[in-house]
Amino acid sequence: MFKIDYALDGPVPWKSEECSRAGTVHVGGTLAEIAAAELAVWRGEPPEKPFVLVAQQSLFDSTRAPAGKHTLWTYCHVPNGSSFDMTERLESQIERFAPDFRDRILARHVSTPVELERYNTNYVGGDINGGVQDLWQLYTRPTIRLVPYSTPARGIYFCSSSTPPGGGVHGMCGYFAAQAALRDL
């Protein structure tokens, strides 16, 4: 994953009014463009027109930015461990759907896959999902258990993108871990 955090002078100037009201926007273009981007990553190449996830929480939480300003974070898929700087491609992709987006940028912080792994050793190669997401892996972390949120230590539970239902289903890992803990009370 290649991630950029932004400080903006105002909200993202989306062409679509619906995007201006969404906490998260998936920017991909046509189905063919999305498929081409993901195929490039699978082949070990940086995508020309990346599939970009855009999170604009300051629209709903005013404590995330000073009055009149906004924060934003974005990411796109890149090959495992890639050192390619996707800033230009990622911002160009956003500008296709939000003209003059770059004019709103006050500051940016770029995180490459290597930096993401340095930040969190579970993000091997920049993979925010904690590695392989197949059925076997989901039920064998950290040990083989019927309830993947429990640990061998009584009363200790865990959740992350490495537990079911996996990354991209925000909050559900924590919800299921809490349910498992409550059942054991």
Task: Name each model-derived stretch.
Residues 1-65:
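Mid-domain catalytic core of redox enzymes
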Residues 6, 74, 94, 156, ...:
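Hydrophobic, well-ordered secondary-structure elements that form the walls
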Residues 7-9, 66-93:
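Conserved FAD/dinucleotide-binding core of flavoprotein oxidoreductases
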Residues 10, 98, 181-185:
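A generic secondary-structure signal for well-formed alpha-helical elements
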Residues 11-12, 38-48, 82-121:
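Flavin-binding catalytic cores
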Residues 49-53, 100-164:
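A glycine-rich dinucleotide-binding beta-alpha-beta segment and adjacent secondary-structure elements
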Residues 62-69, 147-151:
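Short glycine/proline-enriched loop/turn "hinge" motifs that connect secondary-structure elements
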Residues 159-183:
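A conserved FAD-binding loop/helix module that cradles the flavin
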